Amino acid sequence: MAAPVAPSEPQASRAPQPPVCLLVLGMAGSGKTTFVQRLTGHLHNKGCPPYVINLDPAVHEVPFPANIDIRDTVKYKEVMKQYGLGPNGGIVTSLNLFATRFDQVMKFIEKAQNTFRYVLIDTPGQIEVFTWSASGTIITEALASSFPTVVIYVMDTSRSTNPVTFMSNMLYACSILYKTKLPFIVVMNKTDIIDHSFAVEWMQDFEAFQDALNQETTYVSNLTRSMSLVLDEFYSSLRVVGVSAVVGTGFDELCTQVTSAAEEYEREYRPEYERLKKSLANAQSNQQKEQLERLRKDMGSVALDPEAGKGNASPVLDPSDLILTRGTLDEEDEEADSDTDDIDHRVTEESREEPAFQNFMEESMAHWKRNK
């Protein structure tokens, strides 16, 4: 009889993967909102709908279903009226006010992390409003400290056919990469108007970009040539994807690049964030220890022994004792300071009255005898 086959060991249950946060940035008019709309629809069709957050307080209509909308919390026009601000100042202030409650947004994302694989964040149209503001830094670091975070820089391909404009986009991309220090994907949008192959060639082939620049003879072209010598090493290795938010092409390749960027985050960026978090915690702990030690030294320099003042002539009283005995002490001090405390005032007055009375009687008798 054959021996029974031992049941295979159950596979270890895999821990749920945290969602990947996609931070969509780009200059005004590059098609960020349309890109988020198309990417949301693409992920819905793939059976993994994303968790969408809108951070643009000035947009009139959002063409995608937003789970969290900044307009529900902050009224953009009311902020402009109350603080007397212009459009950009209103956006910055609205974003600052929203950033003060971003811990609640993080709680919502944590609750939904087992349901959603992607978190899409659509940022304001003005790129500098989010990238170079304190609120943008707070939001980016809050996301990156808890979830795999990837920056998607949406670039208008049709406006980058000029080498100078292309270099301006690359300068923006490198500045965001330097500021966020997160995995980075350059999304060349509007490929339905013009193919993005020329831009990819300029990014990866320095000589091809120099040949295109040689056709320009302006001062700006010379500046662009100098900048390309410095920045070529940075943007030549960036991930590049060409998409069309209108037609919907290129999003499968984008999802592949997002997966690769999330793996890079877990491999390189998360250990760095953990190290920074640990060093910050150690610095705070050391600061607290120094404050406690300083407080202990300050307390040690003060005499806390109640027996230490026994030998002094004037005893030390509590504030309550001083309040209750103030009148008594003042009277005692006045009596102690008097120079006539050793004289009996009653005896002195009687001794003065007797000779005065005798003098008065003698004068009266003498006056009576004269008149007689």
UniProtKB/Swiss-Prot annotation:
Phosphoserine modification, residue list: 301, 314, 338
Origin superkingdom: Eukaryota
Annotated site residue numbers, Stabilizes the phosphate intermediate: 88
Compositionally biased region (Basic and acidic residues): 343-355
Keyword tRNA processing: no
Annotated localization: Cytoplasm; Nucleus
Residues that bind GTP: 29-34, 189-192
Molecular function in Gene Ontology: ATP hydrolysis activity; GTP binding; GTPase activity
Keyword annotations: Acetylation, Cytoplasm, GTP-binding, Hydrolase, Nucleotide-binding, Nucleus, Phosphoprotein
EC number in record: 3.6.5.-
GO cellular component: cytosol; mitochondrion; nucleoplasm
InterPro entries cross-referenced by the UniProt entry: AAA+_ATPase, Gpn, Gpn1/Npa3/XAB1, P-loop_NTPase
N-acetylalanine modified-residue sites: 2
Gene3D superfamilies: P-loop containing nucleotide triphosphate hydrolases (3.40.50.300)
Chain span(s) of sequence motif Gly-Pro-Asn (GPN)-loop: 86-88
Positions of post-translational Phosphothreonine modification: 328, 340
Annotated region (Disordered), positions in chain: 303-372
Function according to Swiss-Prot or TrEMBL: Small GTPase required for proper nuclear import of RNA polymerase II (RNAPII). May act at an RNAP assembly step prior to nuclear import. Forms an interface between the RNA polymerase II enzyme and chaperone/scaffolding proteins, suggesting that it is required to connect RNA polymerase II to regulators of protein complex formation. May be involved in nuclear localization of XPA.
Entry's family note: Belongs to the GPN-loop GTPase family.
Protein's UniProt name: GPN-loop GTPase 1
Organism: Mus musculus
Lineage: Eukaryota, Metazoa, Chordata, Craniata, Vertebrata
Name of the gene: Gpn1
